[in-house]
A protein has these predicted regions:
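A conserved beta-strand element that flanks and buttresses the S-adenosyl-L-methionine
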Residues: 140
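Short catalytic micro-motifs in class I SAM-dependent methyltransferases
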Residues: 143-144
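Helix-capping/helix-break motifs at membrane-protein junctions
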Residues: 149-150
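A short glycine-rich, Lys/Arg-flanked "PGG" loop and its adjoining helix->strand segment in the class I
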Residues: 154-166
Length: 247
């Protein structure tokens, strides 16, 4: 029997966080809190943004939460509990995560070991500014690009564009520097959270939403901006950037 979307999301949060229980209280509580408190995870599924994408690249993957979320979604769909009014569940052949922090990669490898061993997922400790992105049908970058200078951001985006297959999509969440108080709050929280997770950041390199959109359009993307701060005091925006068809 299919649950209501709200009930389904709660079940999915529990299922996706469960693999982290063996990694310690912090990893498990962080997984539950992030998956339950961040609207982007449910939105990716409800809007079908990753449906049909076989090769997914998650840049700044942390401890692999997006991968665990997609695996839990696929399992739920196979059990017949998928919300009837949602697009089909994503069923990627492989999800590849790139993460700067080695301890997060260790957590991801440990928590999602069955998927790693089955070839469904892989996690690499690397700097996004120099990592090989390979080839992908979808690239996800959530809340990490503003950690590096603008020129480095532009280089990452250009390499993402080169890595995407025809018809590929980039899902990029950013803070809108023109977002007023919400933007200031999100920056303060960002500094606190990244410090707790072992990063040492003195500067965040942010742009107004219009500047992000202009940059992506200049790389050949059609861009749709979707507010992605529901239930939070932040000024976050999800940019759905689809490669334009070449003549």
């Amino acid at each position: 029997m299919t649950a209501t979307p709200a009930a389904f999301i709660q079940h999915l949060i529990t299922a996706a966080a469960e693999p982290y229980r063996a990694s310690g209280r912090y990893a498990w509580y962080f997984a539950r809190g992030k998956l339950g408190g961040d609207p982007v995870f449910a939105h990716l599924l409800a809007a079908g943004l990753l449906t049909g994408r076989q090769r997914i690249l998650d840049i700044g993957c942390g401890q692999g939460l997006l991968t665990s979320w997609l695996l839990a979604a696929q399992a739920a769909s196979s059990r017949g509990t998928w919300p009837g009014n949602w697009p089909d569940a994503p069923r990627p052949a492989h999800v590849r995560g790139i993460e700067l922090m080695a301890h997060d990669v260790v957590r991801a490898d440990s928590a999602l070991a069955p998927a790693v061993q089955a070839g469904q997922a892989s996690f690499v400790q690397a700097d996004m500014c120099s990592a090989d992105f390979g080839q992908a049908d979808a690239v996800v970058i959530l809340d990490v690009l503003h950690y590096v200078p603008i020129a480095a951001q532009d280089d990452v985006l250009a390499r993402v564009r080169q890595s995407l297959s025809p018809g590929g999509v980039l899902l990029l969440r950013v803070g809108d520097a023109a977002g007023g108080l919400g933007f200031k709050i999100s920056n303060w929280v960002d500094h606190v959270v990244t410090t707790l997770r072992g990063h040492r950041l003195s500067t965040l390199y942010c742009r107004p939403l219009a500047a992000w959109q202009d940059t992506l359009r200049g790389l050949g993307f059609d861009v749709e901006a979707q507010a992605m701060s529901q239930g939070t005091p932040f000024a976050n925006v999800l940019l759905v950037a689809r490669l334009r068809a070449t003549p």
